[in-house]
């Protein structure tokens, strides 16, 4: 019986506090990606490129490229090209990226090209914020969308003016790294939390000795590390695999005002309240009537008279009671019982928070 109770208590403790690795909760300060950008040309399009008369920069770029290849275009030549498109190329330089390593690039049209499907990106230098070239991109573009048009009608699925080249850029310059320099490293929490920062510092101190880690603020934990790259790599690997008990998160409801989606975590609770939600709809219908004279030679004129009809409907919402809910399932069940649409639910949640019935932070993105 005692063993059973001990196992039950241990089960309750483990379910209440979930253990996670430090590497899943933090990142090393300074070890991050760097954005690269470049401007280039895509060729080989099946008549879906830029209209060069409306995008003069495409023709100018093509002339510059041809001149670098030793081809001179006569002055005043008006090239009507349909298989070339000017594009912007973006990529992310990973931390500790080495020369010869390949990275993915994203290609996006900046002109009026209809599609980049089947195109090939010509050699494009990718620069950082310091205007230095860190990678060279080139390759065939993979476009996830599809489209067709005929007789004035068109059908399109997903985006056609952007694509991706897997391993399409080669790193030519390495970023200088400060890793291994100094005797301290800073771990940054993914989400600021004073208690979590202190808990991580205490866990490191218990394993590595007192004074090995210090919580500087709600996001930063400073760790003392041995000097040298190899020693710091081994030390950091041991720290990242340590496990800490994750405390309950802040109750939060996130609302996307553009799509109408509502997402909430399991810490959200509701207090008892009463809600009445009414809908107001206005419909405007306009129809053009044609009035013609009865006698063709009477000198009358054909007149178009508009006829407008406005219909206003308001559906009254009855007062509904929402019970206090302490779990996420009960919260979802209570909100579904209101029968509100996602757009209505957004205003209901805002009103509930103002009334003090929603025990959560409301974030609108």
UniProtKB/Swiss-Prot annotation:
UniProt keyword list: Bacterial flagellum, Periplasm, Signal
Example GO biological process: bacterial-type flagellum-dependent cell motility
Localization, UniProt: Periplasm; Bacterial flagellum basal body
What cystine linkages occur within this chain?
A: none
- One Gene Ontology cellular component: bacterial-type flagellum basal body, distal rod, P ring
Q: What is its main location?
A: periplasm
Which residue positions does the secretion signal occupy? 1-19
Q: Spell out the molecular function terms from Gene Ontology.
A: structural molecule activity
Q: Which Pfam families match?
A: FlgI
Q: Which InterPro entries match?
A: Flag_FlgI
Function according to Swiss-Prot or TrEMBL: Assembles around the rod to form the L-ring and probably protects the motor/basal body from shearing forces during rotation.
Q: Which family does it belong to?
A: Belongs to the FlgI family.
Quaternary structure per UniProt? The basal body constitutes a major portion of the flagellar organelle and consists of four rings (L,P,S, and M) mounted on a central rod.
| Protein's name in the database | Flagellar P-ring protein
Q: Which lineage is the organism of this entry classified under, starting from the top rank?
A: Bacteria, Pseudomonadati, Pseudomonadota, Gammaproteobacteria, Enterobacterales
